[in-house]
Amino acid sequence: MFYLLDQPTRNEFQSLARRYENMDPSSVKAAVTLLKTGSDILTGFEKMLKRYGLSQGRFLILIVMNRQPDKPTSPSILAKQIGVTRATMTGLIDGLVKDGLISRGRHGHDRRKQELKLTGKGMGLLEDLLPDYWSRLRKLMGGLTHQEEETLVSLLNKVDAGIPFLTIDNQG
């Protein structure tokens, strides 16, 4: 999460740029605004999910499984699809099974493998949640035209391509 509520002013950014060699005020302002907005969106998203008794991880599992609700899947496939470790996935699955939102069974030919399926209760929860979710996303993006939304996606894809520069050791 990014908790900086009081962002620097234009003059403060300019002052920082004079003090620090690689500080580009425009880039930093854009990145700080993106971090703050993304953090605020995630906070709102988590509050909405909490009303349905879900965390982001549990929601993502249900959403991915809902793409093909009649097709069983495995914990390892789900872990890859939502970007968590298998250990994290085990905890998320245990909670969803306990709440009756998914079922866990054994693979027909390989008893070592687990098969996971959405239950009727899980489908029912999604039927209640998803219209609310879609409506909130529509309102979130309501200030943009469809063309602006497409431009935003294109710009965010460009920013996403630069994420490795946050973690590499050299400053190329």
Identify the residue ranges that each predicted region occupies.
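C-terminal regulatory/oligomerization modules of transcriptional regulators
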Residues: 1-22, 147-172
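Charged, amphipathic alpha-helical coiled-coil/dimerization segments
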Residues: 94-151
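Short, locally clustered residues in the helix-turn-helix/winged-helix DNA-binding domain
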Residues: 35, 63-70, 130, 157
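N-terminal leader segment of winged-helix/HTH proteins
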Residues: 1-52
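N-terminal helix-turn-helix DNA-binding core of bacterial DNA-binding proteins
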Residues: 25, 39, 43-85
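Short, hydrophobic-biased segments on the C-terminal half of alpha helices
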Residues: 75, 93-94
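Pre-recognition alpha-helix immediately N-terminal to the DNA-recognition helix
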Residues: 33, 60-64, 124, 151
